[in-house]
Swiss-Prot record:
SUPFAM superfamilies: Class I glutamine amidotransferase-like, Heme-dependent catalase-like. It comes from Neurospora crassa (strain ATCC 24698 / 74-OR23-1A / CBS 708.71 / DSM 1257 / FGSC 987). The lineage of its organism: Eukaryota, Fungi, Dikarya, Ascomycota, Pezizomycotina. The active site is at 92, 165. It comes from the Eukaryota. It is found in: Secreted, Cell wall. Its cofactor is heme. This is Catalase-1.
């Protein structure tokens, strides 16, 4: 056992030391401490300890006496433990992150003077933190929620924090409403229920009463709110920023991140189950992908509107509850981000990282977006509450460029500032402000005129047009998922006033949608609407418009289900091909001890059928073998694996005798299987009944109608889900 532990520790150490480095990672290495056999236990003040098991006490041969308060070692250990926790983030408490790099491949010098967006030879270190919004730090990953997508760029000119979400709009236009929208979404105050959910009275009461939230809650009820992976979701800056170029010209901009792997989501039943079966699903998925070298990547894009064109649209471009439709303002992709290194320790890096929307570099600025103006105060203020006034001196927050100013003192000050002056101007002319030529930050000379008032422009008062645009732009399956989501959420609202009024609000999006939901949740069905659906659509709102450039199974998890007597030829070929395509084969057996193949070879499964679930994989494959198929056909959990994977619309592959096993488990006449030596695909179920020696020897080509079994099966996996099963109602015909 000690040898196994030693090997595990060595493997973890090698993973960290072999991971890609960067200027920021090198900076952090000064803070590293290695925990290994050569080290000896000490106090925080460096004195070596002889034991960590016994408090200093009065003892005799036959009894234990009182513990002594004089023991400094014991008191330090307890005191340190008692004070380990820092204030939890009010929102975005549940998070995970990674290091990486950012590079522009097309200079945006026409828009900005910021080298991070113009210098194509530069590679900028980044740390990215993904998060849910409503849940506490210990809540589940797969809840229905907005996901935070925050990027800290460690540029040579200072830190730039792009603090966004996986949804491009927000619930409110003005930051003054932030306490209300979050209070309404958090657990209800009288009983602290529910955790990390929007399916309750207060959330939906706020949505009805605050009509500007209508666009955002349609996104929150879409598949965007239950991503398959953090690596498979878009990111958006949400707010309207500005870019200023070297000629002093300003553009309004929105920032976009688009994943290389495409935009994919869980299905709702799967998300619900995973919240209990594997509450760390997203966190582990990101870690596993990076550890396996399947580094997630995103394209970085900019939407830009010239200052003189600010008022040319029927919406206000400073309104955070509105998108800039891409058919009106195309996204220009100029760069790429790759995450390639896991954190060395969660707390001092992922937990203590502090993002501030106010952290920008020269060439990037702020618009008058009223939500952004308030965020610039709120984010900075909350970091002081969580981490103290010197939070930017923490290693993870520390810039990689020189930092010099006359800020002094405060709790947990790390910097030792030498010299005899701590002010400017001073007699030495020490640390003077930088000139523009030296890279000093240039504020745009914006002319402002008006009256002081608590008011918004007329365009800010239109709240339904883009909610309709989003709903209209969904594919049929995405619309059905939104209907199901509204039905689930409002079913959990006990107050008839809440779900009754929300049905009426949905009529402002689409009358048919409202009538369908009314029947599901028991509200009065509206017959008219004050805001008829305008019928317009736009591009790149549906997730179906973001497939990978080529079909791929990269980083997908494929379960191979075996039992004694399995076909080792099919197993070996599938395992090798899955690995070769950068996917992750997971062997599942009736037990975790070794399973014997038909030829006498053995393999030890990664998990057993009861210890793992189909929810945790993207596809399942069952190789043939008469004895194995018979064993699995009598195993209720094995049959449930097949049925659940089918119900969740996942690719299912089977060869040889396992074909009949799959047919028995699904038992639907619409789903047909192979009966000869030809590969057959039906609703994403790929089968090959009669296996020939050459069945697995051909090179695997991932394509529709591929000649080989594995090519066809991998293509089914690459489609993410077989939506036809749901559109044709097959998924609801079996129990899972």
């Amino acid at each position: 056992m000690s040898n196994i532990i030693s090997q595990a520790g060595q493997k973890a150490k090698e993973a960290l030391t072999s991971a890609p480095s960067s200027k920021k990672v090198d900076d952090l290495k000064n803070e590293f401490k290695e925990t290994d056999k050569s080290a000896r236990l000490t106090t925080d003040y460096g004195v070596k300890q002889t034991t960590a098991d016994d408090w200093l006490r009065i003892v005799s041969d036959d009894k234990i006496g009182p513990s002594l308060l004089e023991d400094p070692f014991a008191r330090e250990r307890i005191m340190r433990f008692d004070h380990e926790r820092i204030p939890e983030r009010v929102v975005h408490a549940r998070g995970s992150g990674a290091f990486g790099k950012f590079k522009v491949y097309e200079s945006a010098s026409d828009l900005t003077m910021a080298p991070v967006l113009t210098d194509t030879s530069r590679e900028t270190p980044v740390f990215v933190r993904f998060s849910t919004v409503l849940g506490s730090r210990g809540s589940a990953d797969t809840v229905r929620d907005v996901r935070g997508f925050a990027v800290k760029f460690y540029t040579e000119e200072g830190n730039w924090d792009l603090v966004g979400n996986n949804i491009p709009v927000f619930f409110i236009q003005d930051a003054i409403k932030f306490p209300d929208v979050i209070h309404a979404g958090k657990p209800e105050p009288h009983n602290e229920v529910p955790q990390a959910q929007s399916a309750h009275n207060n959330f939906w009461d706020f949505q009805f009463n605050h009509t500007e939230a209508t666009h955002m809650f349609t996104w929150a009820m879409s598949d965007r709110a239950i991503p398959r992976s953090l690596r498979m979701m878009q990111g958006f800056g949400v707010n309207t920023y500005t870019l200023i170029n070297a000629q002093g010209k300003r553009h309004f901009v929105k920032f976009h991140w688009t994943p290389e792997l495409g935009v994919h989501s869980l299905v709702w039943d799967e998300a619900l189950k995973l919240a209990g079966q594997d509450p760390d699903f997203h966190r582990k998925d990101l870690w596993e992908a990076i550890e396996n070298g399947a580094y997630p990547k995103w394209k970085f894009g900019i939407q830009a509107i010239a200052e003189e064109d600010e008022h040319k649209f029927d919406f206000d471009i400073l309104d955070a509850t509105k998108i800039w439709p891409e058919d009106l303002v195309p996204v220009r992709y100029i760069g790429e981000m790759e995450l390639n290194r896991n954190p060395d320790e969660f707390f001092p890096q992922t937990e203590q990282i502090a993002f501030c929307t106010s952290h920008v570099v020269n060439g990037i600025g702020f618009s008058d977006d009223p939500l952004l103006q308030g965020r610039n105060f709120s984010y900075f203020d909350t970091q002081i509450s969580r981490l103290g006034v010197n939070f930017q001196e923490l290693p993870i927050n520390r810039p990689v460029c020189p930092v010099m100013n006359f800020n002094r003192d405060g709790a947990m000050r790390h910097t030792i500032s030498r010299g005899t002056v701590n002010y400017y101007p001073n007699r030495f002319d020490a640390c003077p402000p930088a000139s523009l030529k030296e890279g000093g930050y240039l504020e745009y000379a914006q002319k402002v005129a008006g009256i002081k008032a608590r008011a918004r422009s007329a365009k800010f008062k239109e709240h339904f047009s883009q909610a309709q645009l989003f709903y209209n732009s969904m594919s049929p399956i995405e619309k059905q998922h939104m209907i199901n989501a509204f039905g689930f959420e409002l079913d959990h609202c006990e107050d008839p006033v809440v779900y009754g009024r929300m049905v009426q609000r949905l009529a402002d999006i689409d009358l048919g949608l409202a009538q369908t939901i009314a029947e599901m949740v028991g509200g009065e069905a509206p017959t008219t609407t004050n805001h008829p659906n305008h019928g317009r659509k736009t591009i790149n709102l549906s997730q179906t418009e973001f497939p990978p450039a080529t079909p791929t199974i990269k980083s997908r998890r494929v379960a191979i289900i075996i039992a004694d007597g399995y076909d080792n030829v099919a197993y070996d070929a599938a395992y090798a091909a899955i690995s070769a395509n950068q996917a992750i084969p997971l062997v599942i057996g009736p037990r975790r001890s070794k399973v014997t193949a038909a030829n006498g070879s053995t393999v030890q499964p990664h998990h057993h059928l009861e210890g793992f679930r189909s929810t945790m994989v993207d596809a399942i494959f069952i190789p043939g073998g008469a004895k194995a198929a018979e064993t699995l056909s009598k195993n209720g959990r094995a049959l449930h694996w097949i049925r659940e994977a089918f119900g969740h619309l996942k690719a299912i592959g089977a060869t040889g005798e396992a074909v009949d096993l799959v047919a028995k488990a699904i038992a639907l006449p619409q789903v047909t299987v192979s009966s000869e030596a030809e590969v057959h695909e039906s609703y994403g179920v790929v089968t090959l009944k009669k296996v020939k020696p050459e069945s697995f020897t051909d090179a695997v080509k991932i394509a529709k109608g591929a000649a080989g079994f594995l090519g066809e099966f991998f293509y089914a996996i690459a489609q993410h889900r077989n939506w036809d099963r749901e559109l044709d109602g097959l998924h609801s015909m079996i129990a899972y």
